[in-house]
UniProtKB/Swiss-Prot annotation:
Subunit structure: Homodimer.
Reaction(s) this enzyme catalyzes, per UniProt: (S)-4-amino-5-oxopentanoate + tRNA(Glu) + NADP(+) = L-glutamyl-tRNA(Glu) + NADPH + H(+)
Name of the coding gene: hemA
Protein name: Glutamyl-tRNA reductase
Binding site for NADP(+): 189-194
Keywords on record: NADP, Oxidoreductase, Porphyrin biosynthesis
Amino acid sequence: MFILTMGLNHHTAPIDIREKLVFKETEEEMALVTLQQEKSILENVIISTCNRTEIVAVVDQIHTGRYYLKRFMANWFQMDMEKIEPYLFFHEETEAVNHLYKVTAGLDSLVLGETQILGQVKHAFEIAKQTETTGTLLNKLFREVVTFAKKVHHHTKINENAVSVSYAAVEVAKKLYGSLDNKKIVLVGAGEMSELALQNLAGSGIADITIINRTKSNAELLANQFQAKVGAYENMNEHLMLADIVLVSTSATEPIIKQAAMQDLMEQKASSMLVIDIGLPRNVEHDCSYIPNFHLYDIDDLAGVVSANSLERQRIVLELENTIEVEVRNFFEWEKQLGVVPVIRALREKALDMQEVAMTSLENKLPGLTEREYIQIGKHMKSIINQMLKQPISELKEMSVEEDATTSIEHFKRIFGLSETDVTVIEKEQAETRS
């Protein structure tokens, strides 16, 4: 078993790519189940936010795991694998675990130290657990990672004066206008990002805030918390006509603010308008940025606003990286103690040895086989082996954390004819690899 992470984020892919590769909240469970059915995938969790789409998986082999993760992503989003591959990154084993710790603690965020990602990772894990696509390894890993991130935010100053994408949006408005006194603001959307924006706007001198949302009751709920007004969704353009600042963050999969409509609106509007689109996929058509006096910012444009973190933050990050390395080592020490990893690898090696013997016999008995035929038969035989071993391996992992784990593992080894020598050799190789 190996831990493998594949994904893309604000470091590796621009927003026009990221917005095409976002898992819809309504499809999360189906995506998890679909991925779990792929060959090589033993466990999986999908993390999908405005700045990243990442899959953390347990796979039986690294190279096949990489292929099937890429294939799943391409198939799910109906894109050619070659088109998305340049934007993907992979982390294996210690790098994968280290990366997850950093992501969850906010060290890999667009906004260093932001706390929103902790809730998003926790939510992703809970969905995967409910969907039963996690097992022994990922259950342990995500629990440890979430606990660590909570301690980080509680005991350090990494999230002091908490900054977020919503915070950055408000800072952009302040830079453009100076004082926000007497400015009229319209929020389109009533979700978490809008709520965070309202929290950051509190005390900024804005007295005229209107919230517009397709579901009016959600807008009313948020408006009551912040003494804001509610506007009718169908009258959005009328409210935009009067706005100085517009923050847009909805779950829409297509732009809801169109270039043609905004062109007409801005020709009639007497003043300029700042529009900050923090949705992903983007909620405002990119061509709106070419309209005179229509100042459009998206998530990637906000990066410069929040990149200048304090020296104190940077110092804390260095300290945390050292602490994370210790956490990662502890996790793999725990994994070794499971006792099943060497057993699984010994089982796989025994199966592959049997395949090699069978292929040699086949070559001797059918000397007329072409090289292409020989290779194809070998691939199909390996595929059968992988499929046959997938369920026993999953069951063994679960046995390893039961009360009678030692007895169960010994029975498993007996059933599959694994000797102590077979397992010991793998244990030594594993120790040398991680030392």
